[in-house]
Amino acid sequence: MLFADVVRTSEAVRATRSRKTKVAALAELLRAAESAELAPVVAWLSGELRQGRIGTGWRTLTGVRVPPALDAALEVATVDAIFDELAAVSGAGSGNRRKELLTRLWSAATEPEQEFLLRLLTGELRQGALTALVAEAVAAAADVPVEQVRRAYMLSGQLPVTAEAALRGGAAALAEFRLEVGRPIQPMLAAPGASLEEAMTEFGGEVSVEHKLDGARIQVHRDGDRIAVFTRTLRDITAGVPELVELVARLDCTSVVLDGETLALTDAGRPRPFQETMSRFATADPARAAEVDLPPGTPVVPPVSSTRELLLHPYFFDCLHLDGRDLLDAPLSERRAALLAVVGEHAIPALIRPEPEAAAEYFDGALAAGHEGLMVKSLSAPYAAGRRGRSWQKIKPTHTLDLLVLGAEWGYGRRTGYLSNLHLGARDPRTGEPVMVGKTFKGLTDALLAWQTAEFPRHERARDEHTVYLWPELVVEIALDGVQVSPRYPGGVALRFARVVRYRPDKTPDQADTIDTVRGLLP
């Protein structure tokens, strides 16, 4: 298959708002791909690389200035092979070797192919063909139910692997996917709850009420002496968090998969700012730290060996596997019992089936301790990997949403010369496209204004005199007092008193909240 076929399909997907048309175009391309081409093609269409990170940052890529090829002759296999070579480069002279490989690739690429490669390698390839959309295309190409593809993907954590199985072996191959210790799965996500009282009533009081920590999500796998720690986005950070590895090694079990959060604490035992915890994740992967321009407030700090105060403390809230037994489909009550049996004091504090008054006091106590609020979880619900559902609800003193930045307006007054007023959007789960729900410049510090002005042009899709419009690639956490019906925006709702809390570099665009979630906050 020619690389140009992938580029043309990507452009066609970007050019239409019809989800049906997007899926059809992607499925047609997948059917045409050879077996060995499926993994890279699926990865690229999802805006990723089969090899993961390959050490090519923005400065390296923009330094490659080669005239484009006139004819489209590059093949998918050739591009993927060069990515393999780039991923293997290390040691002395690695910078020059990467430049040689990139120059070879760029020389063989046409202008549209060069543009695609630049956006792919800088993580800016967002075309509406996010993983959920590509998963639908895989199902269509393989003629299997999309739910089977989604479940297999949740368990494999890798859509290219899932696609290969679907197109080679159909439904039977997808049914073979199981939770595998050592292979991360997509984490279960929570939906915003209207209030503590309503969340408890919805589940008839059969709930676990837990502290909602302002930490970083982790998933820990142990199989005998082999231990791995993964982030929310399934990135392996094992080498950078030795204190977590040592703790898990001491647990009284043979095999276990744990879900939880980790955070840095002050000497008084209070949580440090989220950005400080995230800085440890950056140092857990120096290559990643070099490639990613993190928002202000996310400093790259020395590793734990030289910064004792930034030791990470884990708090586990779910057990997905224990000593040979998978627990994904077990109710939370059963998973919680297994969790307490294996991690003991390292389980997150919780009240089980509390009275409303006790839950309210617990809420106040969580806030006083410096936490974000509470999680209310149904004790009867299974672990819905990769999904954001009502069986987990997050309760905060003010509502927060994770939204996509769709654009920014040039500021005036003290903000003159800076990209300021943000255009905010939620995901439409039916089309995969963002839906604008409001604007805000509230909460933007001088440092964030400067960062936005430098960073946003990397994500630019268009501009006019007043506004720079962005591809929906950046996730920002927004606090709000509520939502209201509004004919001004296409989704029919608008945010009330929205303000920026922080950017979320730990979240991908398909983990942003949906327009349905926003509408669910209507009074």
Curated annotation (Swiss-Prot):
Biological process (GO) annotations held by this record are: cell division; DNA biosynthetic process; DNA recombination; DNA repair; DNA replication
Family statement: Belongs to the ATP-dependent DNA ligase family.
Q: Which domain of life does the UniProt lineage start with?
A: Bacteria
Q: Which UniProt keywords apply?
A: ATP-binding, Cell cycle, Cell division, DNA damage, DNA recombination, DNA repair, DNA replication, Ligase, Magnesium, Metal-binding, Nucleotide-binding
GO molecular function (one): DNA binding
* EC annotation from Swiss-Prot or TrEMBL: 6.5.1.1
- The name of this protein is Probable DNA ligase
Keyword Cell division in the entry? The reply is yes
| Gene (UniProt) | lig
Q: Which InterPro entries match?
A: ATP-dep_DNA_ligase (IPR050191), DNA_ligae_ATP-dep_bac/arc (IPR022865), DNA_ligase_ATP-dep (IPR000977), DNA_ligase_ATP-dep_C (IPR012309), DNA_ligase_ATP-dep_cent (IPR012310), DNA_ligase_ATP-dep_CS (IPR016059), DNA_ligase_ATP-dep_N (IPR012308), DNA_ligase_N_sf (IPR036599)
Q: From what organism does this protein derive?
A: Nocardia farcinica (strain IFM 10152)
The keyword DNA damage appears for this protein: yes
Q: Which PROSITE patterns match?
A: DNA_LIGASE_A1, DNA_LIGASE_A3
Please describe what this protein does.
DNA ligase that seals nicks in double-stranded DNA during DNA replication, DNA recombination and DNA repair.
Q: Which reaction does it catalyse?
A: ATP + (deoxyribonucleotide)n-3'-hydroxyl + 5'-phospho-(deoxyribonucleotide)m = (deoxyribonucleotide)n+m + AMP + diphosphate
Query: In the UniProt entry, which residues are flagged as the active site?
Result: K212
Cofactor names: Mg(2+)
Q: Where does ATP bind?
A: E210, R217, R232, E261, F317, R388, K394
Family annotation (Pfam families): DNA_ligase_A_C, DNA_ligase_A_M, DNA_ligase_A_N
